[in-house]
Amino acid sequence: MTKTLKRPEVLSPAGTLEKLKVAVQYGADAVFIGGQAYGLRSRAGNFTFEQMEEGVQFAAKYGAKVYVAANMVMHEGNEEGAGEWFRKLRDIGIAAVIVSDPALIMIAATEAPGLEIHLSTQASATNYETLEFWKELGLTRVVLAREVSMEELAEIRKRTDVEIEAFVHGAMCISYSGRCTLSRSEEH
């Protein structure tokens, strides 16, 4: 019996509407963008709702999806307006939000049913038990921590059916907040 391998989704960052269009035209299956709220890159040229909607419509012509990074760490008072923001994303056709903070995950799940929630790499998921935890809370995909090795990724894949995303190119973070990864690199 021959096992058919699933083709991985090619997911590209898109910092502007022009970059979104180029990524999709050149074969990206999906793009991730930042909105004007709830993202870590608050100083970047993030998308307005109108630009997001235009991007969603453009991507749909190519069979591609648009995800929005909502990966900020919530501080007291940041939650105001989040429910409405997630509902609007869902209503304009955003395929999923990429979230790391449990408060934002809870708000997105309760306020915007039907909007897929992916766990951001910022949440530092490094083992299958963590993936199972987030699955129980309704997340459909987990972006593994960038520090996960290929061997660890393979083992995680064997032990869970949660959809996995992994960075394969680009910037590498070398530390977690409060965790020293330099000593871990000495082990390998």
Provide a role label for each language-model segment.
Residues 6-32, 36:
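N-terminal basic/disordered segments at the start of proteins
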Residues 9-14, 31-33, 66-70, 97-99, ...:
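Hydrophobic faces of well-ordered beta-strands that scaffold small-molecule active sites
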Residues 14-18, 37, 70-76, 102-104, ...:
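Active-site-proximal loop/turn and secondary-structure-junction residues that shape catalytic pockets
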Residues 32-51, 69-81:
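Glycine-rich, proline-tolerant flexible connector loops at the mouths of alpha/beta enzymes
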Residues 41-53, 78, 100-112, 147-161:
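Active-site-adjacent beta->alpha loops and helix N-cap segments on the catalytic face
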Residues 58, 64-133:
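N-terminal active-site wall of soluble small-molecule enzyme domains
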